[in-house]
């Protein structure tokens, strides 16, 4: 027998009716519109009471226990916003979150009668609550307790189910400036800019022997192909894997590798969509992927997923990476992984040495390597001269440790989880 978690709408209505939280209030006698303070956490004038509604929901939902858990303002705000955004009876009427004097948002019930939802009994779970309520509670708990590991589900359909609306969303929390950092703007936000291209280091191995390495900027993404021609009509810059006959001496192995390359067809496509890296196979041979160390893939266990055919699949999410990087700097975990490994034409080497596989390809997003290096060295200003972020059109980076942390936290609030 446990305590039932409150539902967001009845709980929020009760908070509005009480009027005890600073800035949280009904607008007008009809009580269909209300305002929520929405001050950025890095503003110099930010006070604890500015985030009262977010903390109160974190406590009520069981995501935060005062005195036990570490306060996490960005996560509280994201969870609260996500809970509201999932409600079809609510809409964001006005966004004044960039107002320098009074940052806030105004929400509106699209059905005037919905605000009369009764507050559920939260004393003892008597097992008689509505099935839909149970599903809602379970979903919200899964979302709040989710382990945001970098390896997202391989069957994510990014293009149709999760478009990168967070890039220039009107509901974005990030202001034009990066407060408390002494910077006029956050240079790390270039990572999400539509017009910016990431630089990738691509390395290919045939039976464990490195046969190819190239560092490229690829507008529209890249495609690993096995022939010179490929299909020029497909998007992404084709990167041809080398003829195995030029580097392998075993003829039987050479023949097998050539067979795999011939089945690549249109290639293995990899591109960035906002905070995601997406992949799709355009040929017949299966491709499995996993996040691992730069020096070797994560063998000994199953792959993180299989690259889907004829649709997009998410293979890397920048959001959890940034969150884990912040936690690493705080000393609470190891540095996050960022290297993508692909096993082409064969099953993932979970029970065998990876060097036994015919074709393995490693892809390193150079900007993520730089971010981890900065964290390990205690700030970009601690490295020699300035740091290249390895993004097209980006300026050299030089940040103190405090500036770097502030920019990471600022960037994290721009993420969609």
Curated annotation (Swiss-Prot):
GO terms for biological process: cellular response to virus; defense response to virus; immune system process; innate immune response; positive regulation of DNA-templated transcription; positive regulation of interferon-alpha production; positive regulation of interferon-beta production; positive regulation of type I interferon production. Residues 111-134, 147-170 are annotated as: Disordered. CDD domains: IRF. One of its GO terms (molecular function) is DNA-binding transcription factor activity, RNA polymerase II-specific. Gene3D superfamilies: 2.60.200.10, Winged helix-like DNA-binding domain superfamily/Winged helix DNA-binding domain. Residues 5-111 bind DNA. GO terms for cellular component: mitochondrion; nucleus. This is Interferon regulatory factor 3. It comes from Bos taurus. The gene is IRF3.
